[in-house]
Amino acid sequence: MATVPEPINEMMAYYSDENELLFEADDPKQMKSCIQHLDLGSMGDGNIQLQISHQFYNKSFRQVVSVIVAMEKLRNSAYAHVFHDDDLRSILSFIFEEEPVIFETSSDEFLCDAPVQSIKCKLQDREQKSLVLASPCVLKALHLLSQEMNREVVFCMSFVQGEERDNKIPVALGIKDKNLYLSCVKKGDTPTLQLEEVDPKVYPKRNMEKRFVFYKTEIKNTVEFESVLYPNWYISTSQIEERPVFLGHFRGGQDITDFRMETLSP
């Protein structure tokens, strides 16, 4: 009985076109299966021969699979065939099954479905004017007496998706217990600030539309809010009492753009 030699050092296998035998170190073994003369494309005067053998050995019960791909000249060929890239491609396409690579894309809705982090806070401008809801969709700044402080608007500040740069943090400002968010829109050629009603089943969300997003920047003990959609436009209040909160284009002038923020406990 033939012994199992080492695959590299001792085993020598040759293909016989006449008797379809796999010759080993000791004696020939009859092939279990054989596929010959496969037409894998135009190869000039050569052809491809694929031979597969399954041999079992009693000692180890191992299956040895030998795949031999041989290039041969026709016996009466007058010249040698030059091996080209197309020939290799034909061989590989036979051995390997080509499958398309599918790139899956996900919408932002799924990429940004993490819970939104938010805090409750109150805002007063540097003149200590409080922000109150004067009508369903109008926010005004005015001085309140101590017994009127319950009129002060409580904001739900959500930390949303966006580029953080130079200590600027993207946030959205909604009014607590209301489906209202501060948003920036253009009326004519001028960006303006408004309170926009939203669907509470959708908002707040991580990927807020840009009109709702402001860059919150801390400056000493105050904060300012710059529109992401309209850079260099800021949430502002007037020096005049009981004027609507608006979107201003100037800092450090008559318009007030810096606020004191009081964070409330959850």
UniProtKB/Swiss-Prot annotation:
Keywords for this protein: Cytokine, Cytoplasm, Inflammatory response, Lysosome, Mitogen, Pyrogen, Secreted
CDD domains: beta-trefoil_IL1B
Top-rank lineage group of the source organism: Eukaryota
InterPro entries reported in the protein's UniProt record: IL-1_CS, IL-1_fam, IL-1_propep, IL1/FGF
Cytoplasm recorded as keyword: yes
Gene Ontology, cellular component aspect: cytosol; extracellular space; lysosome
Propeptide segment residues: 1-113
Record has Secreted as a keyword: yes
Site (Important for interaction with integrin): residue numbering on this chain: 168, 176, 178, 187, 201
Intracellular or extracellular location(s): Cytoplasm, Cytosol; Secreted; Lysosome; Secreted, Extracellular exosome
Gene Ontology process terms (BP): cellular response to lipopolysaccharide; cytokine-mediated signaling pathway; fever generation; immune response; inflammatory response; positive regulation of canonical NF-kappaB signal transduction; positive regulation of cell division; positive regulation of immature T cell proliferation in thymus
Disulphide connectivity of cysteines: none
Pfam families per record: IL1, IL1_propep
GO molecular function, one term: cytokine activity
Quaternary structure annotation from Swiss-Prot or TrEMBL: Monomer. In its precursor form, weakly interacts with full-length MEFV; the mature cytokine does not interact at all. Interacts with integrins ITGAV:ITGBV and ITGA5:ITGB1; integrin-binding is required for IL1B signaling. Interacts with cargo receptor TMED10; the interaction is direct and is required for the secretion of IL1B mature form. Interacts with HSP90AB1; the interaction facilitates cargo translocation into the ERGIC. Interacts with HSP90B1; the interaction facilitates cargo translocation into the ERGIC.
Cross-referenced PANTHER family: INTERLEUKIN-1 BETA, INTERLEUKIN-1 FAMILY MEMBER
Function: Potent pro-inflammatory cytokine. Initially discovered as the major endogenous pyrogen, induces prostaglandin synthesis, neutrophil influx and activation, T-cell activation and cytokine production, B-cell activation and antibody production, and fibroblast proliferation and collagen production. Promotes Th17 differentiation of T-cells. Synergizes with IL12/interleukin-12 to induce IFNG synthesis from T-helper 1 (Th1) cells. Plays a role in angiogenesis by inducing VEGF production synergistically with TNF and IL6.
Miscellaneous information on this protein: IL1B production occurs in 2 steps, each being controlled by different stimuli. First, inflammatory signals, such as LPS, stimulate the synthesis and promote the accumulation of cytosolic stores of pro-IL1B (priming). Then additional signals are required for inflammasome assembly, leading to CASP1 activation, pro-IL1B processing and eventually secretion of the active cytokine. IL1B processing and secretion are temporarily associated.
Similarity comment text for this entry: Belongs to the IL-1 family.
Name recorded for this polypeptide: Interleukin-1 beta
Species per Swiss-Prot/TrEMBL record: Bos taurus (Bovine)
